[in-house]
Structure formats: C-alpha cells, structure tokens
C-alpha cells in the first residue's frame, strides 16, 4: 500500500496463474489476469468510487472496474474498506464503457437497504464516471500508468 498525493494505491501482482481470467465488458472479451498481470486499487481521498485497474505484464491497463461507494476508510488491519452502493462501471482502453448492477441498486432501494439519498448519490456518481470515461477525462484511468509505476517503485518489483 502506497500513499501517493491524495490517493492510496494498493498493488497486487500475479506471478504465476493456473489459468487466465477473462471477463466480458460491453461486448468485448478482456483478459484481466495472467502471469505477470497486476491489479491496482486506486482510492482518492473524498472520492465516491474505488477503482481497480487491471494491468497486463507490461503495466498497460486492459480494464477498469469502478465501484461506486458512499465512502471509504482505512480498516483496523491497515487496508482500505468501503461502503458499496451497488453500482459499478467497467471500461476498456478501447473505449467500451458499461454500467453494471442497476437492478441490484433498485432492489436495495425497494428493500430499504439504501436510502433515497444513497440511491441518488449512486446514480449521480455513476453518471459522472461514465461521462468522464467516455470523454477520456476519468483521472484514475488517465493516470493508471503513473499510479502503477509509483506503486511498483515502492514495492521494489
């Protein structure tokens, strides 16, 4: 875990995997885990989202998974935890962007798991993220290579 400006970076590196992991993203099939790949978690102070950047063995981003959250904080074990608001946004460097789990958010509202304020916050943040990704302006995506290098320089890998 690395503090980097107003962000906390957590880097998980896969040295050898038994089998690559592929996911679907807006009609694309994307490999997010294989030998040498890394998952970089980016948590900005005060942000309403937590980003997982999936990077290939060369450190190039291949996929972003963005959890929409109410808040995040450092847990007693020193690792980040967050209050998930159900919605997620996934994207690829090729420009595919997809909103996930809208039905889960609707069900959570109907079951009083989230308040109407949390529901509106989730929708607003997800919309902001989608528009920023589509416009190439979502900072965690734009700065993935920089964040990856910073995290690796501290871990010495």
Enumerate the language-model features and the residues they cover.
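Charge-rich, low-complexity N-terminal segments
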Residues: 1-37
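Well-ordered beta-strand positions
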Residues: 1-3, 43, 90-91
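Residues immediately flanking
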Residues: 14, 68, 102
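A short, polar/proline- and glycine-enriched secondary-structure boundary/capping micro-motif
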Residues: 21-22, 75-77, 108-112
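Phosphate/ribose-recognition catalytic cores of enzymes acting on nucleotide-derived substrates
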Residues: 34-74, 80-87
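A long amphipathic alpha-helix within ATP-dependent nucleotide-binding catalytic cores
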Residues: 66-69, 73-76, 80, 123-136
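A hydrophobic, small-residue-rich beta->alpha segment in the mid-to-C-terminal subdomain
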Residues: 85-129
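Cysteine/selenocysteine-centered motifs that mediate thiol-based redox chemistry or coordinate metal-sulfur cofactors
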Residues: 124-157
């Amino acid at each position: 875990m690395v503090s980097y400006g107003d962000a906390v970076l957590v880097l998980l590196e896969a040295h050898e995997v038994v089998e690559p992991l592929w996911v679907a993203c807006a009609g694309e099939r994307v490999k997010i885990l294989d030998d040498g790949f890394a998952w970089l978690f980016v948590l900005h102070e005060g942000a309403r989202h937590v980003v997982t950047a999936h990077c290939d063995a060369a450190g190039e981003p291949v996929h972003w998974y963005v959890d929409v959250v109410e808040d995040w904080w450092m847990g007693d074990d020193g690792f980040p935890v967050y209050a998930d608001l159900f919605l997620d946004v996934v994207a690829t460097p090729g420009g595919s962007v997809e909103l996930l789990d809208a039905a889960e958010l609707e069900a959570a509202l109907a079951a009083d798991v989230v308040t109407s304020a949390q529901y509106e916050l989730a929708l607003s943040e997800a919309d902001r993220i989608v528009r920023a990704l589509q416009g190439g302006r979502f900072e965690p995506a734009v700065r993935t290579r920089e964040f990856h290098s910073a995290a690796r320089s501290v871990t010495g890998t």
